[in-house]
């Protein structure tokens, strides 16, 4: 994987061994699990070659097909530079003709309402994913979900922004890169309530059977935002694993549980964080952190130092 420098050293344990997680776009320390870098973009080809012959066969010119462009990136553009094949400047009536051709090409590419709506939806999806710093493959999954919803006519009568937000939220859950509804709403043009409604409608319409998000999936991201050690994150995961085994987490929000487990783990490891700090990172209220904290401490019999 390009981008992992051999001179890089883990700031926690001093290791120089790292693992690249392509699903999450993260570089992680192989020994302690500390996230060294997030949102890493793999700029290499999506194919692999083990000999020169394979490389020659699989290499190709042009950008790969993508669901993130309304025509899947299969169209060809007339070059914006007024030059011929030899690099000479085109002048006079030929230049005017080229300009008219470009204008008609733009019009013909998006020539009906459905195409315009799809182009707008995918541009919104790209904007939101960029603001949330989500990896490219996740955007492709979200675009695929949105296109399926269009084909099944689920978009009719609903806001484009709401359904795009729902597709992005569903893609995050499918790919194991959890983002809360609050986080999606923070970059969307519609409310959290509308995103939730649109998501449930899309899930029913497309038959998406997504498992509930585990609170453990939020620990690393929340822990990094709080600046706690790898030990604290590991302890928080142990607390949550035990809580899941005993059925304590059933029916409770995963973000609140992750926040409470991190709060407890930080206290146990001597890295005290306030309930307000933890609540802000997890996008929950201090009351939620406090309630989940009490439940975990009491039901797991944890002795927390005061």
UniProtKB/Swiss-Prot annotation:
InterPro entries, per database record: Cyclin-like_dom, Cyclin-like_sf, TFIIB, TFIIB_arc, TFIIB_CS, TFIIB_cyclin, Znf_TFIIB
Family statement: Belongs to the TFIIB family.
GO cellular component: transcription preinitiation complex
Keywords attached to this entry: Metal-binding, Repeat, Transcription, Transcription regulation, Zinc, Zinc-finger
Positions bound to Zn(2+): 10, 13, 29, 32
Protein name: Transcription initiation factor IIB 2
Alphabetized NCBIfam families for the sequence: PRK00423.1
Native organism: Thermococcus kodakarensis (strain ATCC BAA-918 / JCM 12380 / KOD1) (Pyrococcus kodakaraensis (strain KOD1))
Function per UniProt: Stabilizes TBP binding to an archaeal box-A promoter. Also responsible for recruiting RNA polymerase II to the pre-initiation complex (DNA-TBP-TFIIB).
One Pfam family named in its UniProt record: TFIIB
GO BP field: DNA-templated transcription initiation; transcription preinitiation complex assembly
Chain intervals annotated as zinc finger (TFIIB-type): 6-37
Sequence repeat copies, ranges: 123-206, 217-298
An MF annotation (GO) of this entry: DNA-binding transcription factor activity
């Amino acid at each position: 994987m390009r981008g992992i420098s051999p001179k890089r050293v883990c700031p926690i344990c001093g290791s120089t061994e790292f693992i690249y997680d392509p699903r999450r776009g993260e570089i992680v320390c192989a020994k302690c699990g500390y996230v060294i870098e997030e949102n890493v973009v793999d700029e290499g080809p999506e194919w692999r070659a083990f000999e020169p012959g394979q490389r020659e066969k699989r290499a190709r010119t042009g950008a790969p097909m993508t669901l993130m462009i309304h025509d899947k990136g299969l169209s060809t553009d007339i070059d914006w530079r007024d030059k011929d094949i030899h690099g000479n400047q085109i002048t006079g009536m030929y230049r005017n003709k080229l300009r008219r051709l470009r204008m008609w090409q733009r019009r013909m590419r998006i020539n009906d309402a459905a195409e315009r709506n799809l182009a707008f939806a995918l541009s919104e999806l790209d904007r939101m994913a960029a603001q949330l710093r989500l990896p490219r493959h996740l955007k492709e999954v979200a675009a695929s979900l949105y296109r399926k919803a269009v084909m099944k006519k689920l978009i009719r009568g609903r806001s484009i922004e709401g359904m795009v937000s729902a597709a992005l939220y569903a893609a995050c859950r499918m790919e194991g890169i959890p983002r809360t509804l609050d986080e999606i709403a923070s970059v969307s043009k519609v409310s959290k309530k509308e995103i939730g409604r649109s998501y449930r409608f899309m899930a029913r319409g497309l038959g998406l059977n997504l498992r509930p998000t585990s609170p453990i999936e939020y620990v690393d991201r929340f822990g990094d935002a709080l600046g706690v050690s790898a030990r604290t994150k590991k302890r928080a995961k142990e607390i949550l694993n035990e809580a899941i085994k005993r059925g304590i987490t059933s029916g409770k929000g995963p973000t609140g549980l992750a926040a409470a487990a991190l709060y407890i783990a930080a206290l146990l490891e001597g890295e005290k964080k306030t309930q307000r700090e933890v609540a802000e990172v997890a996008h929950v209220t201090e009351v939620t952190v406090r309630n989940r904290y009490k439940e975990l401490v009491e039901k797991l019999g944890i002795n927390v130092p005061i």
